[in-house]
């Protein structure tokens, strides 16, 4: 499953590059029933000799619709939530053992960047992390304020399914100038599409 999940991100990246060029939705492969709707980057804090997740500032491509099939290929936007870049609560779900394994150890203050299909980059700051029961869905509810909510199963070190707990990260938008000046974090500015 992990190999499929990581390989799919390369195909999704190509579809995303096309979306940024022409503004249209592009399927990553011919039989896909989804398409990328955003690009998510999670910044790594500058802490010497500390490793709290996979590699550097790798970006993840977010698919439309958080179905089980889509989550096998990458994080996915919960369709009942606000679209990336729109007013409201944008909710993205991902598997704890693949793409959202990088949320393990994320802390308040960390910066996230979300690129929309229009090419606009929104920088967010993590304001809360918490573990909740799967029945506590109020964190996914629509809101009038702008926020980004990331959700994955918990605990991270359990590889079998059936988890009743969810790890939730909540972030709010910050001004780009403020984000770039953040002490102890770097901003991933490699959000331009790669065109072959």
Give each language-model segment a name.
Residues 1-196:
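Solvent-exposed, non-transmembrane regions of membrane-associated and secreted proteins
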């Amino acid at each position: 499953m992990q190999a499929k999940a990581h390989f799919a991100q390369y195909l999704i990246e190509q579809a995303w590059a096309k979306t940024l060029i022409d503004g249209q939705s592009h399927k990553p492969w011919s039989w896909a029933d989804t398409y990328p709707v955003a690009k998510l980057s999670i910044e790594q804090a500058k802490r010497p000799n500390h490793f709290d997740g996979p590699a550097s500032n790798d970006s993840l491509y977010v698919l439309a619709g958080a179905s089980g099939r889509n989550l096998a290929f990458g994080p996915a936007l919960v369709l009942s939530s606000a679209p990336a870049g729109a007013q409201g609560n944008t909710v993205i779900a991902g598997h704890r053992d693949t793409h959202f394994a990088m949320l393990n150890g994320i802390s308040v203050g960390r910066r996230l960047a979300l690129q929309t299909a229009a090419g606009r980059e929104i920088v967010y700051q993590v304001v809360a992390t918490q573990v909740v029961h799967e029945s506590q869905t109020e964190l996914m509810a629509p809101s009038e304020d702008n926020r980004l909510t990331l959700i994955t199963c918990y605990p991270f070190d359990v590889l079998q399914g059936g988890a009743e707990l969810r790890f939730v990260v909540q972030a709010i938008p910050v001004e780009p100038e403020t984000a770039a000046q953040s002490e102890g974090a770097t901003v991933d500015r490699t959000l331009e599409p790669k065109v072959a």
